[in-house]
């Protein structure tokens, strides 16, 4: 339930141009990504991505990608929510 609700809230039908793609890559400018990792969310290992569910892909904050099974720890998901990483604007607030 938590995962499904979070995914629907974080990934609306019109995703942010700076958000995560369905392949786990970011559309963020390259100069922004190191700041995201080192200054803001260095403790967040994974964020889930998907239009309506979390069975497809998971994005790793450091720019690499992994299958959903690699980021299946609920604590990481809750931390990401707490830090606002999965807000309705995806990563747009950090651009």
Curated annotation (Swiss-Prot):
**Top-level taxon in the UniProt lineage:** Eukaryota
Record's protein name: Nodulin
- Tell me the lineage of the source organism: Eukaryota, Viridiplantae, Streptophyta, Embryophyta, Tracheophyta
